[in-house]
Amino acid sequence: MSKEHGAAAEKHEFRTEVRKLLHIITHSLYTNREIFLRELVSNASDALDKLRFAQTRGEAAPAADLDLNIAITVNEETRTLTVSDTGIGMTRQELIDNLGTIASSGSERFLKELAEKGEQASNIIGRFGVGFYAVFMVADSVTVTTRSALDASGAWRWTSDGLGSFELEEALDAPERGTRIDIRLKEDAGDFLKKDHLKDVIRRHSNFIPFPVSVEGEHVNTTPALWREPRFQVTEEQYKDFYTFLTFDTQAPMDTIHLSIDAPVQFTSLAFIPNFGNELFGYDRDKYGLDLYVRRVLISKEYKALIPEYLSFLKGVVDTEDLPLNISRETLQENALIAKIRQTLVKQVLAHLAKLAESDAEKYATFWRTHGRVFRMGYNDYINRDKFIPLLRFNSSALDDEKGLCSLDDYIGRAREGQKTVWYVSAPNREAARLNPHVEIFRRKGIEVLYLYEAADEFIMESLGKWNEFEFRSAEHADADALKDFDDVEKKDAPEALDEEGRKTLSSLLSHMKTLLGDKVEDVRESARLSDSPACLASKDGGMTASMEKLMRVMNKDESVPRKVLEINPDHPLTRNLLRLYRADADDRLLAQATEQLYESALLLEGYLRDPHALVGRVNSLLEQATGWYAEVRKL
């Protein structure tokens, strides 16, 4: 670092607020000291931008053949780190104004909070961008040598140890154009003399600066800021390479969302939908967000405030010109611009997914199967409700297999004439849903039922209320009277209808079964919904469904079995056999066993059976009796 200069150096005192700030910075142990390099590179980039703008206006600039670049070099012998640029440079007065006073509101806020809250300085520095002064976290002394591209009055050197004053003098060894910052590093800042460490810092914080940044002659920021490029100029291969750079995932992304927004807020964004969900490989569900850049400089990695949790599968970046570079994380949370970016981003992503669902249903189905568990949680985004609901997907009785998906609008489009209800049933899989006794009446009536496989789906249905004049109801709450206007489309051979005497016996049998079961059930009554099953448990209309009750019991650690209505299918062969048995001997032990078995089988299907041992023992006893009778009849 040369000391050549012209006239004697002028000594200037820092203003009071700067002295306070420098004292805090130089005496604080702050772990994230590398931000000083981000600040210096950002300043250098701004200087290059200003020069380029001046050149486009035709303003004279010395050394016109100089490339626009930023160079970082080290001298291990003198423990000096140098950051230089070929930008617009500074005049004498600009040196005083820019480096002698606090120009950033971030620094002012920093001092104010330190005074008001009395926190440790090391706890606060990281929350505020203190601009150029951050260099004193690592520097014993700093020398800034600069030549303005717009002023022929010469070059100047600014020198300070950060202790309260700075010196200003003419410089005879200044660059042809631009600024050189020589930093004499503290003893504990030796990492910043290592080339690999410097490269890592640049790539993490300043990788997308629009000008070449070199470390010891090696070009470091080689990845272009693709989000700044027009979409039609970016190839799929470039998108894939950038996605890999961002996520380390070698697969191509499932989909790409490239946005350039001018209103109501200006920002650009490049977001990707991965081919795997957050749950895969044990990803931390709480670790999500898009990287926030301000003028290509990284401000916050994986910043959660930019997207709601139901879009947490997105990977990518957001870049805006409208935030100051020195904005802090704390200030970001209170910034109205961030809220506007988030609102706009959510609307754009939902619009993109809507177009995808319409143009490529199979690709959207793949998206749903991969990310639906997280994405479906957007049902509580009431601001975007009308955009979100059409994107929901479910399996259904009208589809061929478990992989099939349909929207609510698809369901409504297939509804029977006069139908104004979307019916659904919760189950762990398609086979369980298909065999659910509550679905039998809908199959008989030719009414489609949505199959819900996720616990959150019932919350979604209950929160929706209505959609396109259709209400949402569980098949468990189906009222046979409400479905009586729909003719049966599935005819089955039924036994001869019970005569008047038979119906009296049935009524008496049901009362007897209620007596046998006692307080275990609310009632035992004839069912109008069952076609194939002998019995089922039913809830009162408006009550919780079985799956919701189970969920609430788990949450409340409640192991009690709720009292339900046991419905009996009067046309089932088992019921007709019980009628014959009841007529012959109401006190027959087999009748009591069969009643208990029907009840516990229904409990088992609904997921309420706590202890299967009694059921298994009873089944074995009944099998023993049945096989004995069978052997006797066959004379074996």
UniProtKB/Swiss-Prot annotation:
Region ranges (B): 330-550
SUPFAM superfamilies cross-referenced by the UniProt entry: ATPase domain of HSP90 chaperone/DNA topoisomerase II/histidine kinase (SSF55874), HSP90 C-terminal domain (SSF110942), Ribosomal protein S5 domain 2-like (SSF54211)
Subcellular location: Cytoplasm
Region feature C, mapped onto this chain: 551-636
Record-linked PROSITE patterns: HSP90 (PS00298)
Pfam families: HATPase_c_3, HSP90
Gene3D superfamilies membership: 3.30.230.80, 3.40.50.11260, Heat shock protein 90, C-terminal domain, Histidine kinase-like ATPase, C-terminal domain
First-listed, main subcellular location of the protein, grouped into a coarse class: cytoplasm
Keyword terms: ATP-binding, Chaperone, Cytoplasm, Nucleotide-binding, Stress response
CDD domains given in the database record: HATPase_Hsp90-like
GO MF assignments: ATP binding; ATP hydrolysis activity; ATP-dependent protein folding chaperone; unfolded protein binding
GO CC field: cytoplasm
Region (A): 1-329
Alphabetical list of InterPro entries matching this protein: HATPase_C_sf (IPR036890), Heat_shock_protein_90_CS (IPR019805), HSP90_C (IPR037196), Hsp90_fam (IPR001404), Hsp90_N (IPR020575), Ribosomal_Su5_D2-typ_SF (IPR020568)
Subunit record text: Homodimer.
HAMAP family xref list: HSP90
Role noted for this protein: Molecular chaperone. Has ATPase activity.
Protein name: Chaperone protein HtpG
Name of the gene this protein is made from: htpG
